[in-house]
């Protein structure tokens, strides 16, 4: 198993010391041998999952090379679901409002793919990164047909993705320390390795107005710039240590803003000078995770740790915030701007919610996600005024018609 995948899956299973405390039952020995030998964190064993979610987690492990015999997969899933069930979480709030939505959801072909980020391509297709299956996927929502593409580097951990002007799909290889490019017409991949091996986890990519690719690298605490014409990569370090740069947007003036998920700050960077400026949020407990931008260049962010929606106006420095409808444990996550509103999902409610915040009235509207959502890590607006979502924990992608 590759080291980066082992580190990522470390959050899924308990330390070897917990082997002595695992309950008896069919599947215990397989879990003990296949899981506890690698993984040290016990977070998810402590919190628990439902059976469908455990099935997805086990298939993510299989994609990463976990030695679970095929005839034992169902037994392992049953064992985990029985002994480590999902614990109560906040109920999804129901707030009425003026908008109407229709959800269309599709299960992706490869079990345990963990769709991480979606992309609404210009041709109407929906792309996604299969983070734990090491692939990119393309869905034709008109037919429901999928096509999967696998980069040359196995288990590269495709994470964020973006389309260039020529229709190529660029993506971050979060486990391989690289940026990838796919030409969908030919299926040909090109990979660009980080010049510094310490930058192992490029995260969110985004093009500037001149076709230069910018990206965050979370654990490495860097911001990167890649020139597609030459392949040259420039890296700069975020001033605050362990700040964990995460989501990213670009303004009409070609200035990039990004969240610093490891601290209570936002930041901006000039792609020409690579100079970074940080902006401290009022509450020290804030941990902004994803970010969205309005046509007027006003920044919104999901305050994941506190259950708030935040607003920052770079023009005057003013900051505002609103409690998310699901409460302090709602875990606001993936977000975007669409039709005069900020849209985002609450990952901490069951089921996950789709939330609409009307910028004119400052009122919320919510909908439960039919499949449960399974943590919507990112979403994107389509050119025709709808939304696409990646639903990691339920192994689905979604198109939300907004009426």
What are these regions (language model features)?
Residues 374-403:
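Blade-level signature of beta-propeller repeat domains, shared across WD40, Kelch, NHL, RCC1
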Residues 140-144, 183-187, 227-231, 270-274, ...:
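Short loop/turn segments that connect beta-strands within beta-propeller blades
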Residues 15-30:
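Electrostatic cytochrome c docking/interface patches
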């Amino acid at each position: 198993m590759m080291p980066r995948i082992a580190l990522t899956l470390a959050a899924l299973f308990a330390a070897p010391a917990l082997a002595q405390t695992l309950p008896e039952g069919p599947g215990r020995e397989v879990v003990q041998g296949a899981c506890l030998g690698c993984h040290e964190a016990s977070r998810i064993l402590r919190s628990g999952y439902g059976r469908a979610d455990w099935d997805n987690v086990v298939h993510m492990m299989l994609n990463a090379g976990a030695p679970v015999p095929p005839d034992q997969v169902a037994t392992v899933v049953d064992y985990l679901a029985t002994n480590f069930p999902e614990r109560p979480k906040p109920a999804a709030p129901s707030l009425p409002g003026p908008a109407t939505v229709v959800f269309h959801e599709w299960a992706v072909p490869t079990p345990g793919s963990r769709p991480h980020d979606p992309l609404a391509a210009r041709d109407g297709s929906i792309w996604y990164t299969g983070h734990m299956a090491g692939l990119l996927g393309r869905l034709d929502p008109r037919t429901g047909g999928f096509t999967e593409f696998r980069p040359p580097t196995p288990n590269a951990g495709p994470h964020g993705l973006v389309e260039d002007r020529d229709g190529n799909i660029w993506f971050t290889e979060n486990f391989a320390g690289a940026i990838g490019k796919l030409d969908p017409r030919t299926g040909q991949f090109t990979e660009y390795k980080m010049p510094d091996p310490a930058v192992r986890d490029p995260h969110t990519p985004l093009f500037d107005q001149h076709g230069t690719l910018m990206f965050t690298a979370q654990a490495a605490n860097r911001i990167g710039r890649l020139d597609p014409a030459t392949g040259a990569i420039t890296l700069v370090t975020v001033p605050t240590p362990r700040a964990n740069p995460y989501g990213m947007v670009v303004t009409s003036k070609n200035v990039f803003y990004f969240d610093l998920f490891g601290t209570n700050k936002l930041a901006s960077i000039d792609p020409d000078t690579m100079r970074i400026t940080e902006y401290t949020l009022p509450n020290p407990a804030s941990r902004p995770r994803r970010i969205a931008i309005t046509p007027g260049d006003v920044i919104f962010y999901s305050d994941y740790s506190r259950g708030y929606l935040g607003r920052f106006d770079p023009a005057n420095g003013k900051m505002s915030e609103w409690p998310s409808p699901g409460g302090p444990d709602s875990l606001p996550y993936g977000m975007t701007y669409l039709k005069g509103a900020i849209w985002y999902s609450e990952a901490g409610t069951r089921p996950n919610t789709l939330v609409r915040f009307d910028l004119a009235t400052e009122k919320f509207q919510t909908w439960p996600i039919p499949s449960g959502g399974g943590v919507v890590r990112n979403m994107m607006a389509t050119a025709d005024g709808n939304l696409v979502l990646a639903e990691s924990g339920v192994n689905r992608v979604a198109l939300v018609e907004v009426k």
